[in-house]
Amino acid sequence: MNIHHLYSTLPSFMIVVFCFVAALIFGSLIEYWVHRWMHNSYRVGRVHSKHHHSNCNQGVIREFMEYAGGSSIFMWPIFFISLEVGLSWSIGILVYAAFSAYSHQLQHDNPSRCFWTRIHYIHHKYNMEQHNFGLAMDVWDRVFGTYKPYKLEPLEEELLQAEKGYLDIKWW
């Protein structure tokens, strides 16, 4: 069965939802591998190490622009299938880029509010340069064997519970 046959037999809404969800999953996989590559590439690693030494981030908007720009290479070819498929795929990629940029910044500025994961916080805090590459989730770290759990000490857990809001982060 080729893609055009599948496209012609499924209802339009199902195709849009499928492409959107597939793009979210694909975006998370790309995020994982790009971050892992940053830790294993000498040239890119030098630039990325500045991020680790300063333990600060560019802000949600700048991170999003960087992620969206890098993801664009994976967006435009899908438009050859159809406009509908291309749009749903691109929106999925951009939604994940926004979620990832927000999660990344939140784990730097206010990790207690990142209730779905603290993997990136742990990656930085405990210098796990060969572990925990996910920014917004740990799924691919678990799949590829790079997940390394770390139990926060009770005092550290208390310190993380600071009274900051979900939007109390660097945006620019």
Regions found by a protein language model. Give the residues of each.
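Short, strongly hydrophobic alpha-helical membrane anchors
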Residues: 1-14
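Alpha-helical transmembrane segments
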Residues: 11, 15-26, 88-93
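Core segments of transmembrane alpha-helices
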Residues: 62-81, 134, 138
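Membrane-proximal soluble regions of multi-pass membrane proteins
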Residues: 107-172
